[in-house]
Amino acid sequence: MSEVITITKRNGAFQNSSNLSYNNTGISDDENDEEDIYMHDVNSASKSESDSQIVTPGELVTDDPIWMRGHGTYFLDNMTYSSVAGTVSRVNRLLSVIPLKGRYAPETGDHVVGRIAEVGNKRWKVDIGGKQHAVLMLGSVNLPGGILRRKSESDELQMRSFLKEGDLLNAEVQSLFQDGSASLHTRSLKYGKLRNGMFCQVPSSLIVRAKNHTHNLPGNITVVLGVNGYIWLRKTSQMDLARDTPSANNSSSIKSTGPTGAVSLNPSITRLEEESSWQIYSDENDPSISNNIRQAICRYANVIKALAFCEIGITQQRIVSAYEASMVYSNVGELIEKNVMESIGSDILTAEKMRGNGN
């Protein structure tokens, strides 16, 4: 004989009216069913409001008071409205609206490019395109020569000789403060002051996050793709080449046999860091940069602008593909014309669809 189990709803939660339970693990099936049905009720209540829903400022998001208000929302007359144009995001019971376009929101571990905005007491304020300036502490930078020691008062007096207002640098987001501003560091030699190149800017939403944001490109050019949408194009240096070689992964130098049979030692990455660290704060650009390098930098900058114009996510592969597609135009200035940018963007998307990895 089977027993009929009925479900009744009381005070917003479901309860089992039967006393029948199977206590195999110390928790009754009735309690599990009650929790499952309750969660289903919460999910179905917001079924009409999809997580991918796009809302506009002033639009009603939900009238259910169960949700906690997050960024991009405001509360009025027991109802939650959107304060920005964006997509609705729900994490547990936190309801927020992510803007379609807006300022960069830093996250720990982000590789960013910034500009020194102010020199203060043992710190620099850096513009990274966010709602607030980031902070770079004096203790978070490498000193010239690569010497690891405590920062002294003399170092504080020489802060402007290291980095001054207007200088560009790439850094990593070390942590976030309570107000959402970022704390940066440049303790690695892959970070620091930027020289011998050109700056360009795209919306931060177009930068595809990856493990590495510094890439060596054809034409002896290196690109630094800041997650914040700030991009730096420069002539490839010895340090950039060393990171792409097997010796960059070993602290000791690697022996190799030359064509004459003699054994030679390739310089290790550590030695290159020591030599380059004396010039990391120099204001002088390399005078030997040729016109071909300058033209290649401008071509890369224009194809990046073309990708941004077509709202295509920017990656190393797409930059190289766009660069190759742009070679049919001998005049670099033509690349920023509307029809040319649309043509390059169309070629990139078509090539990716042909390869079967179009997004």
Swiss-Prot record:
Segments of skewed composition (Polar residues): 246-266
Residues recorded as bearing N-acetylserine in the entry: 2
Domain of life: Eukaryota
Compartments where located: Cytoplasm; Nucleus, Nucleolus
Transmembrane stretches, start-end: none
Gene3D superfamilies in the cross-refs: 2.40.50.100, Nucleic acid-binding proteins (2.40.50.140)
GO molecular function, one term: RNA binding
Residues carrying Phosphoserine: 28, 268
Disordered as annotated region, ranges: 242-266
InterPro entries: Exosome_cplx_N_dom (IPR025721), Exosome_RNA_bind1/RRP40/RRP4 (IPR026699), KH_dom_type_1 (IPR004088), KH_dom_type_1_sf (IPR036612), NA-bd_OB-fold (IPR012340), RRP4_S1 (IPR048565)
Pfam families in UniProt: ECR1_N, KH_6, RRP4_S1
Keyword field: Acetylation, Cytoplasm, Exosome, Nucleus, Phosphoprotein, RNA-binding, rRNA processing
S1 motif domain: residues covered: 107-187
An example Gene Ontology CC term for this record: nuclear exosome (RNase complex)
Chief location category: cytoplasm
One example of a Gene Ontology biological process annotation: nuclear mRNA surveillance
Function recorded in the entry: Non-catalytic component of the RNA exosome complex which has 3'->5' exoribonuclease activity and participates in a multitude of cellular RNA processing and degradation events. In the nucleus, the RNA exosome complex is involved in proper maturation of stable RNA species such as rRNA, snRNA and snoRNA, in the elimination of RNA processing by-products and non-coding 'pervasive' transcripts, such as antisense RNA species and cryptic unstable transcripts (CUTs), and of mRNAs with processing defects, thereby limiting or excluding their export to the cytoplasm.
Subunit architecture: Component of the RNA exosome complex. Specifically part of the catalytically inactive RNA exosome core complex (Exo-9) which may associate with the catalytic subunits RRP6 and DIS3 in cytoplasmic- and nuclear-specific RNA exosome complex forms. Exo-9 is formed by a hexameric base ring of RNase PH domain-containing subunits and a cap ring consisting of CSL4, RRP4 and RRP40. Interacts with LRP1/RRP47.
PANTHER family in UniProt: EXOSOME COMPLEX COMPONENT RRP4, PNAS-3 RELATED
Protein family per UniProt: Belongs to the RRP4 family.
Further details from the record: Present with 4840 molecules/cell in log phase SD medium.
Protein name as it appears in the record: Exosome complex component RRP4
Natural source organism: Saccharomyces cerevisiae (strain ATCC 204508 / S288c)
